[in-house]
Amino acid sequence: MTVEERSNTAKVDILGVDFDNTTMLQMVENIKTFFANQSTNNLFIVTANPEIVNYATTHQAYLELINQASYIVADGTGVVKASHRLKQPLAHRIPGIELMDECLKIAHVNHQKVFLLGATNEVGEAAQYALQQRYPNISFAHHHGYIDLEDETVVKRIELFKPDYIFVGMGFPKQEEWIMTHENQFESKVMMGVGGSLEVFAGAKKRAPYIFRKLNIEWIYRALIDWKRIGRLKSIPIFMYKIAKAKRKIKKAK
């Protein structure tokens, strides 16, 4: 099958990435409706932060790939603030890990199946165990994320398992590339790249305390506890510069 066509929700163009102007509540309803309609297509969700948008601006193939997703939501306050600067305000930030958790709540109620693809075997198994304790009605399976895009072994395992959700935690761009490489081999799945969410659910990484999330500075906490991320912080001023440049271009066009 193929992915569901782009939703008919209002779009907000942030440096070429077509974000859906939606809320967490609306996304939950969209996912419920997808299963209720028994579509044979797949629902492909991208949760894009400033780093992903930056990458997309310099990698045309990736930009075109993610713009084929059923939904693109703003995972990061930087994207929401950018939308306001460009006078196209997005309604809400929708963190990928929280959207994944909302999917798991739906799966728990409906006794569905979830396939976790990503991280190491140890981390993946720990995430699966933790989630199984939280959501006992879900059937889980896991495979590590250290695979080539063309590897058919894991695809065959997924086909045999017949999950309702496939969460791919390989980091961008690989997770989205994997989804679009193989989505036509599946049907009726919710497919979403979830970055490092498996590490968080496994307890290998901590999510920022509530106060950091409330103040929309979760990225600062992540950098403080994981020095490997410091180098990635340079994407923020680059993103801000690109937004300022886009804003000036819009003003000149008026």
From Swiss-Prot:
Which residue windows are transmembrane per the record?
none
Q: Is Transferase among the key words of this record?
A: yes
**Keywords, comma-separated and alphabetical:** Cell wall biogenesis/degradation, Glycosyltransferase, Teichoic acid biosynthesis, Transferase
Q: What EC number(s) does its UniProt record assign?
A: 2.4.1.187
Q: Which InterPro entries match?
A: TAB_Glycosyltransferase, TagA_TarA, WecG_TagA_CpsF
- Please state the pathway this protein functions in, per its UniProt record: Cell wall biogenesis; poly(ribitol phosphate) teichoic acid biosynthesis
Q: Name one GO molecular function term.
A: N-acetylglucosaminyldiphosphoundecaprenol N-acetyl-beta-D-mannosaminyltransferase activity
**Coiled-coil annotated residue ranges, if any:** none
Q: Spell out the CDD domains in the cross-references.
A: Glyco_transf_WecG_TagA (cd06533)
Please give the catalytic activity noted in the UniProt record. Answer: UDP-N-acetyl-alpha-D-mannosamine + N-acetyl-alpha-D-glucosaminyl-di-trans,octa-cis-undecaprenyl diphosphate = N-acetyl-beta-D-mannosaminyl-(1->4)-N-acetyl-alpha-D-glucosaminyl di-trans,octa-cis-undecaprenyl diphosphate + UDP + H(+)
Q: Which GO terms describe its biological process?
A: cell wall organization; teichoic acid biosynthetic process
The record's similarity note reads:
Belongs to the glycosyltransferase 26 family. TagA/TarA subfamily.
Q: What functional role does this protein have?
A: Catalyzes the conversion of GlcNAc-PP-undecaprenol into ManNAc-GlcNAc-PP-undecaprenol, the first committed lipid intermediate in the de novo synthesis of teichoic acid.
Q: What is this protein called?
A: N-acetylglucosaminyldiphosphoundecaprenol N-acetyl-beta-D-mannosaminyltransferase
Organism per entry: Staphylococcus aureus (strain MRSA252)
Taxonomy-wise, where does this protein's organism fall, top ranks first?
A: Bacteria, Bacillati, Bacillota, Bacilli, Bacillales
